[in-house]
Design a protein with these regions (language model features):
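Conserved glycine(s) of the Walker
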Residues: 22-23
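Conserved phosphate-donor/acceptor-positioning beta-strand/loop module used by diverse small-molecule
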Residues: 129-152
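Conserved substrate/cofactor phosphate-moiety recognition/catalytic segment
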Residues: 27-105, 117
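Pre-Walker A adenine-sensing motif
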Residues: 1-6
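Hydrophobic anchor at the beta1->P-loop junction of P-loop NTPases
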Residues: 15
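Conserved GTP-binding G-domain of TRAFAC-class P-loop NTPases and closely related GTPase folds
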Residues: 145-227
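The conserved Walker
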Residues: 18-19
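Acidic, metal-coordinating catalytic cores used for nucleic-acid/nucleotide bond scission
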Residues: 110-119
Length: 227
């Protein structure tokens, strides 16, 4: 996948999907990410860990907490939500007042997008920075939650089961709301894709509306269990 014919500037991909859904595999196999700056929670967690090790005010409570354990991961997740540090990190990357109008970096947001208001808030911020709705694209990685739970238990960096379940539910709900235009305040109108069982479904192209009564929309709805 290479949105807008591989444009080198001004493109944004929201990679949507619950924890352990296979988003990293999707990037490796299906997305031409070489020209994108990737923003993901792991990078933010590493910054938080470094801050705690240096004794920076506000991160003392993370000292000695291992983010690679279920308990530690829950602590880091809650800290990210409480401080909104992930949003601030994204703003620092995107808000460069000295760049030219055609030099907005391509961005790949690799996160669950499972929280209410997450897609709306980030997309609105991007529009304020100068990005365009038709250049904000969606790639939803859909995986059965039981498969995600199994994957999570088999990898070295594990999360608590409730994080896996809730992130899967939240990501699915937000994607459905966006797809069927219930998320009216989100300025997102780029290419829409869904990845299921390592197959890519192209739902719509940039600038077009989703044909909610068409065959593709019905196929997606059946896959997601809403038809």
């Amino acid at each position: 996948m290479s949105p807008n014919n591989g444009a080198k500037y001004g493109q944004v991909i929201f990679l949507v999907g619950g924890a352990a859904s296979g988003k990293s595999t999707a990037i490796r196999k299906f997305i031409d990410s070489s020209s994108y700056k990737t923003i993901n929670p792991d990078g933010v967690k590493d910054l938080m860990r470094q801050a705690s090790e240096k004794g920076i005010t506000g991160f003392e409570d993370l000292a000695g907490v291992d983010p690679n354990t279920p308990k530690g991961a829950s602590v880091y997740h809650q800290k990210m939500r409480d401080t909104k540090i992930s949003s601030r990190y994204s703003k620092r990357i995107t808000s460069d007042p000295n760049r030219s109008a055609d030099a907005y970096p391509n961005l790949l947001f690799d996160r669950t997008f499972s929280f209410a208001g997450e897609i709306e808030n980030i997309s609105k911020s991007l529009i304020r920075y100068g990005y365009k709705p038709e250049n904000i694209h969606i790639v939803y990685v859909f995986t059965d939650v039981n498969i995600a739970l199994k994957r999570n238990r088999e990898r070295s960096r594990t999360l608590a089961d409730d994080i896996i379940v809730q992130s899967a539910k939240g990501a699915k709900k937000n994607f459905i709301d966006l797809l069927f235009q219930r998320m009216k305040s989100a300025p997102v109108n780029g290419d829409f894709f869904m990845i299921v069982n390592e197959r890519v479904i192209t739902i719509k192209k940039s600038g077009k509306r989703v044909d909610r009564s068409g065959d593709v929309a019905k196929k997606v709805a059946r896959t997601l269990g809403i038809l």
